[in-house]
Amino acid sequence: MPKKVFCGTVTKAKCDKTVKVSVLQVYKDELYKKVIKKYKKYTAHDENNSCKEGDKVLIQEHKPISTTKKWVIVNSSH
């Protein structure tokens, strides 16, 4: 089974080796045909502390690192 990969924006980078990434999902409601934006925040592991707030990053599923961290930063474009 392939690992999930999401693209998002770093919203919080204050903790050591941990960042909060906000991922946008856009979908259309089947009944009302309205476009809906849904944001979800993921806690991701940043090994090198290289990410800053506002950076675009790719996160990938990983085995649990801590209670809430189950994602790892794969690629960050500054």
From Swiss-Prot:
InterPro entries: NA-bd_OB-fold, Ribosomal_uS17, Ribosomal_uS17_bact/chlr, Ribosomal_uS17_CS. HAMAP family: Ribosomal_uS17_B. One of its GO terms (biological process) is translation. SUPFAM superfamilies: Nucleic acid-binding proteins. GO terms for molecular function: rRNA binding; structural constituent of ribosome. Signal peptide: none annotated. Belongs to the universal ribosomal protein uS17 family. NCBIfam families: PRK05610.1, uS17_bact. One of the primary rRNA binding proteins, it binds specifically to the 5'-end of 16S ribosomal RNA. The keyword RNA-binding applies. GO terms for cellular component: cytosolic small ribosomal subunit. It comes from the Bacteria. This is Small ribosomal subunit protein uS17. Keywords: Ribonucleoprotein, Ribosomal protein, RNA-binding, rRNA-binding. Disulfide bonds: none annotated. Part of the 30S ribosomal subunit.
